[in-house]
A protein has these predicted regions:
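Alpha-helical transmembrane segments of multi-pass membrane transport proteins
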Residues: 1-607
């Protein structure tokens, strides 16, 4: 029995190495070893009777409903041309500075991550749109391909993210808390990308040139760039956000009719950002409708292109953070919002809906098949005490929490070369989560850390999925540029691989930062005070004892009068000859002390 769990795990690896689909490998391995265990007498015959109930439990999991809604939202936005507009507009904003196109790709990647959340869609969209432009104006090929692949993988860590939804479900934690924990690491990683591009632009200016003047599309009639009005609009929006954040308690007092002294930080942030975005949109809309001429073409373009996706992000994340909606409800509203945006842009039609629904159905079916297979495997694996084997294997690693985290991250890093994040989440995470919890590791921290690790594996050559996505759309033959008429050489696979190396190093630095500074994840979470069971036990033991026994009965209590009935014998409900309580009452008086029972239960729990 002790060797059955490792043999079963090795059997799963053999199934996967033979090339069978992961879902069927999991299910077949679970059924095979389950029936073998029953035949050998290692497992009870009733074990498999629990399988239908577990599968129905999957179907009733409301958290997993967020997956099709989120996928549908991302696909509608991606196919409605939002990425093209964002890249064109932000590219014009940052174009005049060295490295401007690379900065635009990073920021658009972050926005697409917060709206579509699909790595393949982000990488392919930016590869089709921005790579030809970057090659046209002389960007280094390794820098261009690396920044596109790295920015596309931000969809793994920036909320809302499919990876974080599944992590929360498998680790038994709130999706909202997982989103909050991933916010700071996502922004830090984006900042590290920006810092690297800025360093390259300063040290090697020829690798990241600025856009030439003739490539800048949005200019005023007098030839000016239009930046001053954009800066003024941003300043007004910033002032509105600061005002709302500082006076949120006063606003609540005015609305509710009684004094409110404190407002949650999440509410302040969401309300302030929403207010700033709405004010900017109203100013731009009023300027266009009334033809006031207060804003430049660039300022208007930036406002009307950026505001809709930002509002959609606030609709999804804001409602989740404020507790107005569950993650499933928030993402469902996001899908409806994406459809409304596509309608307003005139891009929603039956062809787009069919493509989006078809892709959503395929992904949802893929996830459900893997989850059912993982359920079969985990049922049998738990039956043979597999989790205890994994726990003993990992808790004996040197270094405590840090040693465990380093070993697990190395393992996940290499497994992610061959397995998709869905497969890793359903196979490996349920085995590692209980061990991390036993070691005292915060599971939100653990989940975000593994999500960043999986993001790193998306880019590691030669197995990174993001590199394959980019290779599929990067030019592999020499072609003539339509704008300049120049002959552009092809992008080689080795250029894509070498371009990803600096960003893999940046992501590994981010993993190390999260391991040694968990406050980057847990700092923004609501603090939950843990109960020290030893302190509770000591407190109960030191409390003055209470007498919970029945009070003594008066003499003659319960005895019939001599003139109405014969005396009853003791033991038949009458008092004993000395006037004490009956035997049944004496047994009740000897019952264990409830306080002692609580102490015994706590001691047993600590064991």
């Amino acid at each position: 029995m002790s060797n059955f769990a490792p043999i079963m795990f090795a059997g799963l690896i053999v199934f996967l190495l033979l090339g069978f689909p992961v879902a069927f490998s999991l299910g077949a391995c679970g059924l095979f070893f389950g029936f073998v265990g029953i035949e050998l007498g290692l497992l009870p015959e009733a074990l498999m009777q629990a399988l239908p109930l577990r599968i129905f439990g999957i179907m009733q999991n409301e958290t997993l409903l967020a997956i099709p809604f989120f996928t549908l939202m991302g696909l509608i936005l991606e196919r409605s041309g939002m990425a093209e507009d964002l890249l064109e507009t932000i590219g014009q904003v940052f174009g005049p500075m060295r490295g401007g196109l690379a900065f635009a790709v990073i920021f658009v990647g972050a926005l697409l991550a917060a709206t579509t959340g699909v790595v393949a869609a982000s990488v392919i969209s930016m590869g089709l749109i921005s790579l030809p432009i970057m090659l046209r104006y002389g960007y280094d090929r390794r820098l261009a391909t690396g920044i596109i692949a790295a920015s596309g993988t931000l969809a793994q860590i920036i909320p809302p993210s499919l990876v974080l939804i599944i992590m929360a479900d498998q680790l038994g934690r709130s999706v909202g808390d997982m989103y909050k924990g991933a916010f700071v690491p996502g922004f830090i990683l984006t900042g590290l990308y920006v810092g690297y591009v800025a360093l390259v632009a300063v040290v090697f200016p020829k690798r990241a040139p600025a856009l030439p003047p003739e490539a800048r599309a949005y200019r005023e009639s007098n030839g000016s760039s239009g930046y001053p009005s954009l800066v003024v609009l941003m300043a007004i929006s910033t002032l509105v956000a600061v005002f709302l954040a500082r006076h949120m308690a006063d606003i609540h007092t005015w609305l509710e009719g009684h004094e409110v002294t404190s407002v949650p930080t999440d509410e302040k942030i969401v309300a302030a950002l929403c207010g700033a975005v709405v004010v900017a949109f109203l100013i731009a809309a009023g300027n266009r409708a009334l033809k006031l001429g207060l804003l430049s073409k660039l300022a208007e373009r930036v406002t009307f292109v950026l505001i809709p996706p930002l509002l959609l992000i606030f609709l999804v994340l804001g409602t989740i953070f404020l507790g107005i909606a569950t993650p499933t409800e928030g993402v469902a509203m996001g899908a409806v919002g994406a459809m409304i945006m596509a309608i307003l842009r005139g891009k929603l039609n039956m062809s787009l809906m069919k493509q989006a629904l078809n892709a959503t159905l395929k992904l949802s079916s893929f996830v459900m098949f893997i989850l059912v297979g993982a359920t079969v495997f985990s049922l049998v694996f738990q039956g043979v005490d597999g989790p205890r084997w994994v726990e003993h294997l990992l808790t004996q690693l040197p270094g405590g929490q840090v040693g465990f985290l380093i070993a697990v991250n190395i393992m996940i890093f290499f497994l992610a070369f061959f397995l998709d994040f869905f497969e890793l989440s359903f196979i490996v995470i349920p085995l590692l989560g209980p061990v991390a919890d036993k070691l005292g590791i915060d599971l939100i921290w653990f989940g975000v850390l593994l999500a960043v690790n999986m993001q790193t594996s998306f880019m590691h050559p030669p197995f990174g999925f993001a590199l394959f996505y980019l290779r599929s759309v990067a030019p592999d033959k020499e072609y003539t540029d339509k704008v300049t008429g120049q002959r552009i050489p092809p992008v080689t696979t080795m250029q894509i691989y070498w371009g990803s190396v600096p960003f893999v190093c940046i992501q590994l630095i981010m993993v190390a930062l999260l391991i040694f500074f968990p406050g980057l994840v847990t700092g923004g979470l609501d603090k939950v005070e843990k109960v020290d069971m030893d302190k509770v036990t000591n407190m109960l033991e030191n409390m003055p004892s209470q007498d919970y026994s029945a009070p003594p009965m008066p003499p003659g209590f319960g005895a019939p009068s001599s003139d109405t009935a014969a005396p009853a014998t003791p033991g038949e409900g009458a008092s004993a000859p000395d006037g004490s309580a009956p035997a049944a009452q004496q047994e009740g008086a000897a019952a264990p002390d409830p306080m002692q029972a609580v102490q015994d239960a706590l001691k047993q729990e600590n064991k």
